[in-house]
From Swiss-Prot:
Example GO molecular function: 14-3-3 protein binding
Family assignment from sequence similarity: Belongs to the DDIT4 family.
Protein name per UniProt: DNA damage-inducible transcript 4 protein
Tissue: Ubiquitously expressed.
Length: 229
């Protein structure tokens, strides 16, 4: 799949100049590739565990401590964020995300087209901008892992990087959920062992508007920040 940065480099250059000069970019090192591998491992490990346990197991806090920790985290109001470049990149990222979801494979036998409601697209975009606001390279420094929660397991769908030439400075794991009203459809999709594959997509499934984003700074030892929406 062509990188998002290559596809939109011409339009991005006209919006504004880069937030961080090339000389200020983080040095390329082994942790850049290690971050990508870690993101894939995180999504893979979720496939055999309850996604809800991710909040406590990764943060190092119990339910009460974790809640109080998040209460103390201060993020800027979205109205105060005004970065034309990041907003432009975010719109392109959401387009690439929807394309990746339209080619998702939840089960091992049949593909499915996962659809994001417009409300979900808007909410995810705003949350990514909020989490990227304090980063040295903004949204360009993000490595986005996309997972879809199904019952007590998660399926890794995609890993997206806005600028593959830039060593990522922070990692976001986006956990989406299937609409619970579609359970009969989902069960039929995953249990169709004897049905043969046909070209195209057998099912179109709508995602719930609820989601979770887990942020990890790759240049810091800070605790994971978990945003539940």
């Amino acid at each position: 799949m062509p990188s998002l940065w290559d596809r939109f480099s011409s339009s991005s250059s006209s919006s504004s100049s880069s937030r961080t000069p090339a000389a200020d970019r983080p040095p390329r090192s082994a942790w850049g590739s290690a971050a990508r591998e870690e993101g894939l491992d995180r999504c893979a490990s979720l496939e055999s565990s309850d996604c809800e346990s991710l909040d406590s197991s990764n943060s190092g806090f119990g339910p009460e401590e974790d809640s109080s920790y998040l209460d103390g985290v201060s993020l800027p109001d979205f109205e105060l964020l005004s970065d034309p470049e990041d907003e432009h990149l975010c719109a392109n990222l959401m387009q690439l995300l929807q394309e990746s979801l339209s080619q998702a494979r939840l089960g091992s036998r049949r593909p499915a087209r996962l659809l994001m409601p417009s409300q979900l697209v808007s909410q995810v975009g705003k949350e990514l901008l909020r989490l990227a606001y304090s980063e040295p390279c903004g949204l360009r420094g993000a490595l986005l892992d996309v997972c879809v929660e199904q019952g007590k397991s998660c399926h890794s769908v995609a890993q997206l990087a806005l600028d593959p030439s830039l060593v990522p400075t922070f990692q976001l794991t986006l956990v989406l959920r299937l609409d619970s009203r579609l359970w009969p459809k989902i069960q039929g999709l995953l249990s169709s062992a004897n049905s043969s594959l046909v070209p195209g997509y057998s099912q179109s499934l709508t995602l719930s508007t609820g989601f979770r984003v887990i942020k990890k700074k790759l240049y810091s030892s800070e605790q994971l920040l978990i945003e539940e929406c």
